[in-house]
Amino acid sequence: MREIVHIQAGQCGNQIGAKFWEVISDEHGIDPSGTYCGDSDLQLERVDVFYNEATGGRYVPRAILMDLEPGTMDSVRAGPFGQLFRPDNFVFGQTGAGNNWAKGHYTEGAELIDAVLDVVRKEAEGCDCLQGFQITHSLGGGTGSGMGTLLISKIREEYPDRIMETFSVFPSPKVSDTVVEPYNATLSVHQLVENADEVQVIDNEALYDICFRTLKLTTPTYGDLNHLVSAAMSGVTCSLRFPGQLNSDLRKLAVNLIPFPRLHFFMIGFAPLTSRGSQQYRALTVPELTQQMFDAKNMMCASDPRHGRYLTACAMFRGRMSTKEVDEQMLNVQNKNSSYFVEWIPHNTKSSVCDIPPKGLKMAVTFVGNSTAIQEMFKRVSDQFTAMFRRKAFLHWYTGEGMDEMEFTEAESNMNDLVSEYQQYQDATAEEEGEFEEEEGDVEA
C-alpha cells in the first residue's frame, strides 16, 4: 500500500511527533505496547501506511527519531508511547546543536546524517510502494532546522520522485524562544523552497491563540499545541488510511495546491474546535464545519488569510456526510467570497471525503490552503533577519562553523524573492498579465 515514512528532528519535531503517534495509534486501535485492541476491521485494513507489522502481530511505527542531544528522546522513550518505537530508529548525538543552524547543517549534523540515512533506507526498503516522507521539525532551533533541511536534501537526492512533506514550526511574531531564530529560519526556508514538495506552516503563537480563544484553555501546554497539530496531520493522511468516497493523497494534494513550484507553503486548519463547555450548544453540520474551517482564527499560523487571496485550497472532510453537500458548501464559499480567491484559477478548491471520523467526533475537516497572505510570515522573519544581519550580529557563531556570509545573503534574497512572487500573484488579474488592479477593501465572510 501507499506507505509514508515519518521523520522527526530536534526537540520540537520529536514532541510533535510523539503526540502525532498517540493520535494515530488511537485511531488505528493500537495500544502503547503495539498490540491491536480496536473494534473495527477498517482500522487494520490500511494500517501499513504508518506501521510495520512485526512478529507476534505487533505494530511498529515507521518512524525515525533524530536529535543531536539525547534529552528529548529519553523523554519520548519514557512517555506513554515510548515502547512503541523500534529502538534502532532512535538516532542521536551527544553534543547538541545549540540553536545554531550551521552546527546542525554542516558540522555536528553532518557527522550524524549517515546513521540517519541508513535507518531511512531500511524503512524505505520495507515499503511496497513508498508514497513519500513527512518530517516534523521547527525552523527556529539548530537541529530541526539545520539537520532537518540537510536530511531533506539528502533524501531528495536519493528519492527524487517521492513526495517530501514537512510540518515546519516557524518563529512566532511576538513570542521568541531564541535570539537567532530569524537566521535559522531564513537559512531553512532557503532549503525548503528548493527541496520540499509541500510545507505546512505552523507557529506557536497562532496555536496559543486557538487554545485561548476557541478552546478556552487558561494555561495551554506544549502538549495541547501539539495535539492541535497532530489532529491536522492525521487529517492530511486520513484518505490513505481509511476508505472514503473521494480520496486524496500527498501527491494529489500537491498537484491540486501548487500552481507554481516555489509557492508550496500552506496554511493548515482543523475544525471543529470548541471549548469543553460550549459543545452541546452547537450542531456539527457541513456548513458549520466549512464556516469554521475558513475562519481566520482557525489557521495554525499567524498570517491572516483576509490580507491575501487563496491561490488554491483543499478541504478533507471526515465522517458520514453527503458529498453533494460538501461540494455545494465549497462552491458557496467561493461564490460568496470571490474576492478572496484568485479569479485566474477557476474552481480552485479541492475536497475529499473520508468515511471514518477522528476519535470522539462525528465529523471533522482538515483544511490546507495556499494563500498569498503567508508572505506576511516570511516578511516578518526577513525584516528581523535584515536588522541583525546588517550589523553582522551573532554571525561569528555561524562563520566559526565554516559558513560563508554569501550564504546568508543568498538565503535573504531567496526569501525576499518568495515574498515578491506571492505579491505578484496576489495582484495578478485574469484579463491581462502585467496589468495590476487596485485591491478591494476587506469584506467579512
From Swiss-Prot:
Keywords, in A-Z order: Cytoplasm, Cytoskeleton, GTP-binding, Magnesium, Metal-binding, Microtubule, Nucleotide-binding
Residue sites binding GTP per the record: Q11, E69, S138, G142, T143, G144, N204, N226
Gene3D superfamilies assigned to the protein according to its UniProt record, in alphabetical order: Helix hairpin bin, Tubulin/FtsZ, C-terminal domain, Tubulin/FtsZ, GTPase domain
Region ranges (Disordered): 426-445
Statement: the UniProt record of this protein carries the keyword Nucleotide-binding: yes
Cofactor: Mg(2+)
Pfam family, one: Tubulin
GO annotations of cellular component type: cytoplasm; microtubule
Compartments in which it is found: Cytoplasm, Cytoskeleton
Keyword NADP tagged: no
PANTHER family (alphabetical): TUBULIN
Complex and partners: Dimer of alpha and beta chains. A typical microtubule is a hollow water-filled tube with an outer diameter of 25 nm and an inner diameter of 15 nM. Alpha-beta heterodimers associate head-to-tail to form protofilaments running lengthwise along the microtubule wall with the beta-tubulin subunit facing the microtubule plus end conferring a structural polarity. Microtubules usually have 13 protofilaments but different protofilament numbers can be found in some organisms and specialized cells. Interacts with DCX/apicortin; the interaction stabilizes microtubule assembly.
Other comments on record: Tamoxifen used to treat breast cancer blocks the interaction between apicortin and, alpha-tubulin 1 and beta-tubulin resulting in microtubule destabilization.
Name recorded for this polypeptide: Tubulin beta chain
Species, as recorded: Plasmodium falciparum (isolate 3D7)
